[in-house]
Amino acid sequence: MTEISDILLRTILDSRGNPTVEAEISTISGGFGRACAPSGASTGIYEAKVRPCDEAVADAYINLIPKLIELDSADQRGFDDTLHEVDGTSDLSGIGANIAVALSLANAKAAASTLNMELYQYLGGAFISQTPLPLGNVIGGGAHAVDATDIQEFLIVPTGASTAAEAVFTNALVHKRIKEILIARGKGCGKGDEGGWAPHIADLEAFEIVNEATTKVFDETGIEVRMGLDVAASEMWDAASGRYVYKNAKRTTEEQIAYIADLTEKYNLIYVEDPIQEEDFEGFARITEEVSGRDTLICGDDLFVTNASRLEEGIRNDACNCVLIKPNQIGTLTDTFETISLAHDYGYETVMSHRSGETTDNTIAHLATAFGCCFMKSGVVGGERIAKLNELIRIEEHF
């Protein structure tokens, strides 16, 4: 019933106008799954490797697809094991991580469709009853914008929202209020890759603006909205000098830790992603300890790249208390699930995330719900972002 009967691959556009891979899988009983590979602008050095799309698709039709036809789509681990076997490398550079993630997710969706189940139900089971809160980028800089803030993402999460719909609309309202504040201050209102505003302002002013906007929204709605950051510190790190290079400062690791800890206290940050460069497990452990008296999540993205082996090293070093989950970093749903399971076993929170180069694929809303992630990081506005946010609203209607 769940046997794979047909697989199609194609090259499509992502939100930055770059090519990416889309996969479609059909089963003999009429099940169907479609999924797309996203891409990042600031990528970790340990991420699985992508291949040029047209070349990877052509190779897959010759060397990979024939070995997937007639597999049981309900055997996700078996499907993903076949991807690894054909690939033959440790980083998916053989078939390409973009091919692997599109096929792996499409396979799970095809199996769920065959069984007439929603993907989150198929993966998460009968007792799933809660969606994650949306974590959204409202001011962007770093690798996502030109001549904007040093910190890559100024984030918000509506901790006071009682439903997914309320949370999604609250984040959108903060985004609107930020535009109004920027206009009032005479600042430009361009947007970065993920839909956050990308004004030519310093980090300090960005903090002030987001704080003002969240206060306005609380006064209007009574819903508390907390701030977070994606520092993307690896993008600032200069190994030659041993400094984190900002526009107006160069900080040692000690100074970076003190700076982030001060921001966390001053702005009551609920979430700080990649405050330290991706090779420094000790630095991550020190900042995690520094803020341990607060409810702040110190999240590893480039540090862990959704890789269970990297996470095991983090656990040994007491680095972080949260893991960012990006399926395309590791390439398959099975590997993604294993990293999430390991994180939860050791008390780490997990955050399911989009990439800066996205499509209208909404799969991560289902994964975030099925796997018990506390947040879904997916932007606030833009068609490729709201596709995921609106899916959260739809999913919650089933509870």
Swiss-Prot record:
UniProt-annotated location(s): Cytoplasm; Secreted; Cell surface
Residues that hold (2R)-2-phosphoglycerate according to the record: Q152, K326, R355, S356, K377
Pfam families referenced in this protein's UniProt entry, alphabetically: Enolase_C (PF00113), Enolase_N (PF03952)
Active-site annotation: E194, K326
HAMAP family linked: Enolase
Family: Belongs to the enolase family.
Protein name, as recorded: Enolase
Gene behind this protein: eno
